[in-house]
């Protein structure tokens, strides 16, 4: 009887060991499969010819710009509007070359870009801890959450008159308008990202001792990164629009001539070509910031999470 029990136990132990061995083997197989897929994707990405990459990424926007220029020139030739309402592409290009020769073109751009980036960094420093606080503290969310949503929907231009009355015509007024426009977007983006973190991650972090600031740094922020990045992109868009509204409305010689002031000067001088120049420069800066800063960050985050789809 004892030998039978011993044999049964041995069989159970053998079966258990075999099962564990099979589980380990399955785990190794799965890890190997994932590594192989990652290597395959990397190899495919690495084998993409430069010519194909340029055609796939550069040709569509170049074609779109060329099409816009052709349609624009056709409208000018058709005289659908007088010259003082619709300038020709060559007239706008003349404005570009004149500003370049006078040495003012880069000054226009840098005046606005430096303000916009500095204001965005200040909004980032305020909106990030505010978003963490709103997302993690129920009372703060109930009290401040609706206000942030309301501020985000409020047009930034509405803040320019009170900012001028409070602070005067200076750079502080510009930064105040940027903060009021961008902070709610950054905070709400982080809140949305934190709300999308699986509760299992948070419980696992608490079990392993990641609480307080450690939990926020190692669990919450990495888990909320996709939503947070979307909030940052929207925050920059609000920063840039807020700055343009402030520069257009609150103009002063002491503030220098930024792109918004250039647009307003064109209106005051009835120079539609200068107005178009300012609009194109504002658009160009927005596209450049997205392509050089936010798009690489977004691709890196998605690639690190296995969510990047290559086409």
Segments the model singles out, each with a brief description of its role:
Residues 154, 194-200, 204-224:
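Short helix-to-coil transition segments within interhelical loops
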Residues 118, 269-298:
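A membrane-interface signal for the N-terminal entry of alpha-helical transmembrane segments
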Residues 45-53, 78-121, 261, 265:
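Periplasmic/extracellular loop-to-transmembrane helix junction in inner-membrane transport proteins
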Residues 149-185, 192-193:
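Generic hydrophobic transmembrane alpha-helix motif, especially the helices
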Residues 176-180, 212-246, 277:
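Transmembrane alpha-helices
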Residues 118-148:
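Transmembrane-helix boundary motif in ABC transporter permease subunits
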Residues 1-63, 291-311:
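Transmembrane alpha-helical segments of polytopic membrane transport and secretion proteins
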Residues 165-166, 242-276, 281, 306-311:
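Glycine-rich helix-loop "coupling/hinge" segments at transmembrane-helix boundaries
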């Amino acid at each position: 009887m004892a030998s039978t029990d011993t044999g049964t136990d041995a069989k159970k132990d053998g079966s258990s060991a075999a099962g564990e061995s099979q589980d380990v083997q399955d785990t190794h197989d799965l890890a190997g499969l994932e590594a192989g897929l990652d290597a395959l994707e990397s190899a495919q990405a690495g084998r993409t010819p430069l010519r194909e990459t340029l055609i796939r990424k550069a040709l569509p926007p170049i074609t779109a710009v060329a099409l816009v220029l052709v349609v624009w020139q056709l409208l000018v030739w058709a005289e659908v509007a007088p010259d003082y309402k619709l300038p020709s592409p060559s007239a706008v290009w003349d404005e570009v070359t004149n500003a370049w020769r006078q040495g003012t073109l880069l000054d226009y751009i840098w005046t606005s870009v430096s303000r916009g980036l500095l204001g965005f960094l200040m909004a980032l420093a305020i909106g990030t801890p505010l978003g963490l606080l709103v997302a993690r503290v129920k009372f703060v969310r109930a009290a401040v959450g609706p206000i942030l949503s309301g501020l985000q929907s409020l047009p930034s231009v509405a803040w320019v008159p009170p900012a001028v009355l409070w602070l005067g015509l200076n750079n502080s007024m510009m930064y105040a308008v940027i903060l009021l426009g961008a902070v709610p977007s950054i905070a709400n983006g982080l809140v949305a990202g934190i709300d999308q973190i699986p509760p299992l991650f948070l419980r696992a972090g608490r079990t392993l001792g990641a609480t307080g600031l450690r939990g926020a740094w190692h669990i919450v922020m990495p888990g909320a990164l996709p939503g947070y990045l979307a909030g940052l992109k929207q925050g920059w868009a609000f920063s840039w629009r807020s700055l343009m509204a402030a520069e257009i409305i609150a103009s002063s010689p002491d503030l220098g001539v930024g792109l918004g002031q250039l647009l307003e000067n064109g209106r005051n001088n009835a120079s539609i070509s200068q107005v178009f120049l300012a609009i194109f420069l504002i658009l160009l800066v927005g596209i450049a910031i997205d392509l050089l800063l936010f798009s690489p960050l977004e691709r890196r985050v998605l690639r690190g999470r296995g969510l990047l789809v290559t086409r």
